[in-house]
Amino acid sequence: MKKAVVLLSGGLDSTTCMSVAHKAGYELYPLSFDYGQRHQRELEAAKAVAQYYKVKEHRLIKIEHVGGSALTDASIQVPDYTEDGQIPVTYVPARNILFLSYALGYGEVMGAEAIFIGISSVDYSGYPDCRPEFLQAFQKVVDVGTKAGVSGQTIAIKAPLLYLSKAETIQLAAENGAPLHHTTSCYRGGEKACGTCDSCTLRLKGFAEAGIKDPIDYVNQGDRSCFSTPLED
């Protein structure tokens, strides 16, 4: 069976990505990261998702000395959702470069054909490492900088959600039977999702537009003025 490394955060996008890889017939090898993020609950969610798919191995990599972000530094406040067009303080420097590099090394050792990453350039927070240009550049690195690549057996970097809106991602997850009830998206990392951070707002907006009820609990459901479809109470 063909093998795939799946970058699994425990969030909505990575879980949907996992469902796509599963449906495509890959043997799944999820990889999760503890980089000191304040939303440690996502690691519990990732474990639950991995167990749902009955994977052979779920690796957790600890990365130290990552900082400079509201997601890692207690001194930087996680802001509520905004559409100011700026790269937000929740950007973690070089995060996807680090994650993909670890996944690439792991994948080359165990003979993976693909690495799945749940990035999107549509409904996203403006992070530069979630754009098509980044994905294309990293694929080039794989092609010319690995034994697999120069031997003509390169590892494909797959981002099936890259051009999907959040609503389309949620619809795809529903079609694939992805366990979204196990997921968490909140940057603040409380027992219940806050409902007002960037990630919560984009998630709630996506569920509203998809016409599907979000299976997780929120402290509140934030500012609904940005939703084209009203949320159900």
Curated annotation (Swiss-Prot):
Q: Which reaction does it catalyse?
A: 7-carboxy-7-deazaguanine + NH4(+) + ATP = 7-cyano-7-deazaguanine + ADP + phosphate + H2O + H(+)
Q: Where does ATP bind?
A: L8, S9, G10, G11, L12, D13, S14, T15, T16, C17, M18
Q: Keywords on this record?
A: ATP-binding, Ligase, Metal-binding, Nucleotide-binding, Queuosine biosynthesis, Zinc
Is ATP-binding a UniProt keyword of this protein? Answer: yes
- The residues listed in the UniProt record as binding Zn(2+), with positions renumbered to this chain, are C186, C194, C197, C200
Q: Which GO terms describe its molecular function?
A: ATP binding; ligase activity, forming carbon-nitrogen bonds; zinc ion binding
What is the required cofactor set for this protein? Zn(2+)
Q: InterPro entries annotated for this entry?
A: QueC (IPR018317), Rossmann-like_a/b/a_fold (IPR014729)
CDD domains given for it?
QueC-like
Q: How is the cofactor bound?
A: Binds 1 zinc ion per subunit.
Named in its record, the pathway it takes part in is: Purine metabolism; 7-cyano-7-deazaguanine biosynthesis
What Gene3D superfamilies does this protein map onto?
HUPs (3.40.50.620)
Q: What EC numbers are recorded for this enzyme?
A: 6.3.4.20
Keyword Nucleotide-binding found = yes
The biological process GO terms on file are: queuosine biosynthetic process
Family according to the record: Belongs to the QueC family.
Summarize the protein's role. Answer: Catalyzes the ATP-dependent conversion of 7-carboxy-7-deazaguanine (CDG) to 7-cyano-7-deazaguanine (preQ(0)).
Oligomer status and interactors: Homodimer.
Q: Would you tell me the protein name for this molecule? A: 7-cyano-7-deazaguanine synthase 2
Q: Which organism is it from?
A: Desulfitobacterium hafniense (strain Y51)
